Amino acid sequence: MAKICGIDEAGRGALAGPLSVAACVLNSEISGLNDSKKLTAKRREELFKKITKSSNFLIAYFSNAQIDELGLSECLRRALKLFKAHFESFEIIYDGNLDYGVGITTMIKADGKVAGVSAASILAKVSRDRLMNGWDKFYPAYGFAGHKGYGTKSHLDAIAKFGYSDFHRKSFVIKPKLAQSSLF
């Protein structure tokens, strides 16, 4: 059986910040791997260190401006195409149900089933979270370190009070009903 290159992303549904897409080929077994959303932040950091020391990986970032210009689907397609070219001798498994025309294997919930995809999930999440923690220092009023750019009540409240920052995705529209019930 061919060695597996797992791919997953973080930040897909966020209102601010980048989309982080990671590809990972594990060179040794790492215990405790799972979908990054099912792990604590502390455990993700521990596993991130192990993964980066014992695997081949790439992480692609797409800024909020690139997401606004290209759209999420095109950003994902470009990352998958890059990873397919870089890891061409591996079986590539992407967590999801769309291959974006790239010709790779997709698997729903692969981040909880395939070790390489779990590792990619952790790489994407931890690297993006670290970026959001850094951006929190430039935009403290928005609380990025807490919600990581996702549409929590506190984030929606900050947008209502301060407007969009340069780090927000302008193409992501907050639905009026949600804005009225959550923002005011």
UniProtKB/Swiss-Prot annotation:
Its cofactor is Mn(2+); Mg(2+). Pfam families: RNase_HII. It is found in: Cytoplasm. SUPFAM superfamilies: Ribonuclease H-like. GO terms for molecular function: manganese ion binding; RNA binding; RNA-DNA hybrid ribonuclease activity. A divalent metal cation binds at residues 8-9, 95. Residues 2-184 form the RNase H type-2 domain. This is Ribonuclease HII. It comes from Campylobacter concisus (strain 13826). The gene is rnhB.
